[in-house]
Amino acid sequence: DLMQFETLIMKSGVWYYGSYGCYCGSGGQFRPQDASDRCCFVHDCCYGKNGDIVCGGDDPCKKQICECDRVAATCFRDNKVTYDNKYWFFPAKFPPQNCKEESEPC
């Protein structure tokens, strides 16, 4: 859940990453701005490969979604030093021309 995710990354996931760089938050796209933003790119790619899956019980797809979250949380934690406040609310603070370089494919 979100609280466990935030504990692992040692930051508030929604507050710090809900609108960070070009990729974190809703509708992420274009080239990630730094290693923290890249964590969101990798997480989105992981979910994209698995589709919008809602699973329960011992279903293996639930395990894969949890693995996407685990990898992302570890990525955020390991790259916490790259977090740069200039990218916080980046798309909102700056015009979208800052997020226009295409990202590599997943």
Swiss-Prot record:
UniProt function note: Snake venom phospholipase A2 (PLA2) that induces inflammatory response, with local edema and release of cytokines IL-1 alpha, IL-6 and TNF-alpha. Does not exhibit myotoxic, anticoagulant and antibacterial effects. Release of pro-inflammatory cytokines may be due to mast cell degranulation, and edema may be induced by arachidonic acid that results from the PLA2 catalytic activity. PLA2 catalyzes the calcium-dependent hydrolysis of the 2-acyl groups in 3-sn-phosphoglycerides.
Name a GO CC annotation attached to this entry. extracellular region
Q: Does the keyword Nucleotidyltransferase apply?
A: no
Catalytic activities: a 1,2-diacyl-sn-glycero-3-phosphocholine + H2O = a 1-acyl-sn-glycero-3-phosphocholine + a fatty acid + H(+)
Which residues are responsible for catalysis?
43, 69
Q: Carries keyword Disulfide bond?
A: yes
What are the subcellular locations of this protein?
Answer: Secreted
Q: List the disulfide bonds.
A: 24-40, 39-75, 45-106, 46-68, 55-66
Cited SMART domains: PA2c
Main localization is secreted
Q: Which organism is it from?
A: Bothrocophias hyoprora (Amazonian hognose viper)
Q: Name it.
A: Acidic phospholipase A2 PhTX-III
Entry keyword set: Calcium, Disulfide bond, Hydrolase, Metal-binding, Secreted
Q: Which InterPro entries match?
A: PLipase_A2, PLipase_A2_Asp_AS, PLipase_A2_dom, PLipase_A2_dom_sf, PLipase_A2_His_AS
Please tell me in which tissues this protein is expressed. Answer: Expressed by the venom gland.
What does its activity-regulation comment describe? Partially inhibited by magnesium ions and completely inhibited by zinc ions These divalent cations may act as competitive antagonists of the cofactor.
For the ligand (Ca(2+)), the binding residues are 23, 25, 27, 44
Kindly list the GO molecular function terms attached to this UniProt entry. calcium ion binding; calcium-dependent phospholipase A2 activity; phospholipid binding
Cofactor(s) needed, names only, are: Ca(2+)
